[in-house]
Amino acid sequence: MKKLLFFVMVGLLALSGTLVSAQGGDLPALDELSEGWNELRPGGETICSNGTEYAFYVRPGDSDKLLIYFNGGGACWFGQICDLNAHPTYVPVVETDHNNPATHVGIFELDNPENPFADWSMVYVSYCTADVHIGDAVVTYDVPASDDMEAHQVTINHKGYANAMSALDWTFANYDAPKTIFVTGSSAGAIASPFYAGLVADEYPEARIVQLGDAAGGYHGEEVQAPLSAWNTISILPDWPEYDEVTADGLSFEDLYVATALHTDNVTMAQYNAAEDETQYGFLSLVGIADPLPQLLDEAYQTIESQSGEELYTYTAGGELHTILRRPEFYTYEVGGVRFVDWVASLVAGEDVGDVMCDVCDVAPNAE
């Protein structure tokens, strides 16, 4: 069995990089922000899983080009993996380098001349609610007794929707008419990205919008209904006819792609995955799905395209590496003669990129 890369917090890491913080009351407008990354703490209903304060981040840039990024950081939906003293599988707080864009590389390497997003405006939706940004619930989970602890309960604030919408509401109020918008996310954020791309399209119907999910395409199966039910995701679905037939016991991650594709006419949808992604295998095991990841990816891709009637552009690399957008491999991975950075740049430019698929899928591109 593949080893699950747990997102265990063993201590709070100090934020590094240059951040300007704004906290409480009315958030500053775009023209009041400093250069570089600004930390905004919206307050109100926003909250992290353990009750600590939430924050998102903004980096001013070209207002015609807007990047909205949903960070990853695991998830939980039953006691043993929600309890920070047991086997946690998520990041519970904002105050960690994991949620600090100033510490990331890849698309956040702003001084790299190959970065297609170097001059873009960026909104970074940090993540600390263990619900892949699409929860609206406060849940008390039972944690059974183990060798080193008695049975007990743990309460988790699955308020990812409130947190994400605080960032989007600020964005909608401060960016009037961006021409091109890249809505993306890694891991947990990848799952949420098609859902929020649809809401962004409703706000900016004249913009050209590109969505890319980074490393979460394999969660295909009815077993995912357990976490979606725990997070009360059905309650956040917008009042679109495309969701009329979706029920709480039938909701899938593919539905988020299909509904947005059917609802909009200005969104291009795409995914990146590694064919043997170690972390996807780990979470698949937790939900009870044992099928090979390449099979699940293929089935999910086909489901999205057949139900939406739209093309889903995919780039599937070999190997086990989980996520790419925040990593140096964003610039180095090459499959079938196509570098990933070039594929993304062409995708965002509105070009027909086609699908890219590994020939040797059990090793990473730089190991072929």
Predicted regions and their residues:
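Bacterial N-terminal signal peptides
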Residues: 7-16
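C-terminal His-loop and adjacent cap/lid subdomain of alpha/beta-hydrolase
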Residues: 23-368
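Sec/Tat signal peptide C-region and signal peptidase I cleavage site
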Residues: 18-21
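Positively charged n-region of N-terminal signal peptides that target proteins for export
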Residues: 1-4
